Amino acid sequence: MRISLLFSVLLICVPAYAVPCTKATTECTEWVKLGQQAQALIYRTYALDQKNDRVARALVVVHGQGRDADNYFRTALAAAFLAGALDDTIVISPRFASNNGTGCRDTLAANEVNWSCAGDSWRSGGISTSNKELTSYDFMDEILRKLARKDIFPNLRGIVLTGHSAGGQYVTRYEMANQVNDKLGVPLTYVVSNP
């Protein structure tokens, strides 16, 4: 009886932590609001609006020209797992969706921001084809602002923003042009691969 009572007391004293979402399915997605009517999709291991004392680092992975954020999310999950860092790392892969008819035929949800695949596209901070007030950099700015909230992620020590191929082009340009780097209060590291 004493052992079960002691065990019950210990269970009450142990904080409950969120479990990372580890599937590249809708259960691991979240909509990021961009203005009043616009939204953009991310894959993520933890919700951006629920307090999480456990998260110490963030890894934001930008997909390539194929706009396959789900595959990049899977790869980043595997890397975090192999590094033994899955539980205290929030992994995010934003989706720059497009269905502008030039080889890009993503299915968009209601109010989902549509980015161009050609010309002044999402990889260069281009203006959305569905909302002329938004650029692809606005989307990343909002993700980073949410990560830097101390009331949600009080123990976040650093953010890594990385991209491969067209995602690498995006990260290179974003590093030079973003408006939030010096305002976040969290160190931000940029890693570019095969731009």
Predicted features along the sequence, with ranges:
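A domain-start/cap signature at the N-terminus of enzymes
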Residues: 16-58, 66-90, 115-132, 138-139, ...
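Bacterial N-terminal signal peptides
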Residues: 4-13
